[in-house]
Amino acid sequence: HFNFMNCSYNEYHIAETSDYAVDFHKNNPKVKLIKYDGKNLPYQNETFDRIIISHCLEHILSPEEFIQEMMSKLNKGGVLSISLPTDPGLAWRLGRLFIRFFTIKNTYQISGEEFNYMNATEHVNSIFNLISIIRFNYKNSYEEHFYPLRIKMSDFNLFYNVHITKRD
């Protein structure tokens, strides 16, 4: 999702667990790529002013630990920005239904059943649980947004974005 980020930093550090993703970004001169184990980010604590996580937490088995690891790498006052799909919200399910019937079969040559299986095994955390983890652990430190309707309800939106500021 890096190509859809609308930021103008001089340098980006991308930590990936996937060889495919590392290969995808290797020709961008602004990007410093590292491959990592998905648990321990190989940077010293208090290194970054901003960390952006786009569509990752729904795939991670221990999202609370992952967020804590990211927060440890932020400078005081730094911001962790997280973007998530609102899976299994109603709007997300309707979007998946549309994709399943009109895109998946033609583009990826897989059945709807295979598509559902892929999502079930890859999206191990629901948006409802992830929001609860964020709200509980970062009270008074976060600003959240729902898109496209901007109503604070996961069922009626496709994406949840949150910015957590490191206070201590």
Task: Give the positions of each predicted feature.
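Conserved SAM-binding loop
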Residues: 1-90, 160-167
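S-adenosyl-L-methionine-dependent methyltransferase catalytic module, highlighting the catalytic core
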Residues: 61-75, 79-167
